[in-house]
Regions:
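Alpha-helical support elements that line or immediately flank enzyme active sites
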Residues: 25-51, 157, 167, 173
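Hydrophobic faces of stable alpha-helices that mediate helix-helix packing
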Residues: 48, 75, 79, 157-164
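Low-complexity, Ser/Thr/Pro/Gly-enriched N-terminal "stalk/linker" regions
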Residues: 1-21, 199-200
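Conserved hydrophobic/aromatic pocket- or pore-lining residues that grip, position, or stack substrates
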Residues: 1, 32, 78
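Solvent-exposed loop and edge beta-strand segments that line ligand/cofactor-binding
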Residues: 13-29, 63-75, 142-157
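Short glycine/serine- and small hydrophobic-enriched flexible loop segments
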Residues: 34-37, 80-87, 162-172
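Active-site acid/base region of carbohydrate-active enzymes
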Residues: 1-4, 38-39, 51, 56-60, ...
Length: 202
């Protein structure tokens, strides 16, 4: 975690479990907020927004994965969770949705620039949600090697679609977001082309 000296975790965060998993995990937290939104929407929105604040999000746009390895990559589900929380709360808090969208643009750019190493819209990953079933350590790939992953690429396609859906919601209030709709549609199209060209099996 030596590259995360900016991180200042003094907030009350949702944990996967008080006993077995007493630490935050950014993607677990995103799923928790969808449930919390039915009970306390403001708390759910706070949980999502705080992980995108400058004292958590890396200056390069990465989100901290979990306490023992902030650098790991978790599935990018924050956009999906933010939109679900917005909808559960009555689709009225556009200030929240807009703020989250702007921060997620930084995170999305980090994924595109860092994880698509070959620029072919086929994404690498690491740990991407497959708990304890990887046949190899996908986080620590040997020097000179790389793994292009079907699941990493699928998660990025999902991320594109969620950002597109958020941009559509925002564009209904502010036409300036229409160009962002096209941006994410173009990204999604590029990923589908990349999948067709590369193949997702070996």
């Amino acid at each position: 975690n030596q590259n995360w000296r900016h991180l200042d975790a003094y907030d009350v965060l949702s944990m996967p479990d008080a006993w077995e998993y007493p630490w935050f995990a950014a993607w677990d937290l995103a799923f928790h907020t969808v449930v919390f939104a039915h009970i306390d929407p403001e708390y759910a929105k706070y949980q999502l927004a705080v992980m995108l604040r400058e004292w958590y999000m890396h200056p390069n746009g990465a989100l901290p994965a979990y306490e023992w390895s902030f650098d790991d990559r978790n599935p990018p589900v924050h956009a999906w969770a933010a939109l679900r929380v917005f909808e559960i709360d009555g689709s009225r808090d556009f200030t929240f949705l807009q703020g989250v969208f702007h921060k997620l643009l930084i995170n999305f750019t980090w994924w595109v620039n860092r994880v698509d190493a070959q620029g072919n819209n086929v994404f690498e990953g690491g740990f991407l949600g497959l708990d304890n079933i990887g046949p190899i350590d996908r986080t620590h790939v040997p020097a000179g090697c790389r793994i292009e992953q079907a699941d990493g690429t699928a998660w990025m396609a999902f991320y594109c679609l969620q950002m597109l859906r958020i941009a559509m919601r925002l564009a209904a209030k502010d036409p300036a977001y229409r160009s962002m709709m096209l941006k994410f549609l173009e990204h999604f199209s590029g990923i589908t082309d990349g999948v067709a060209d590369a193949g997702m099996w070996d």
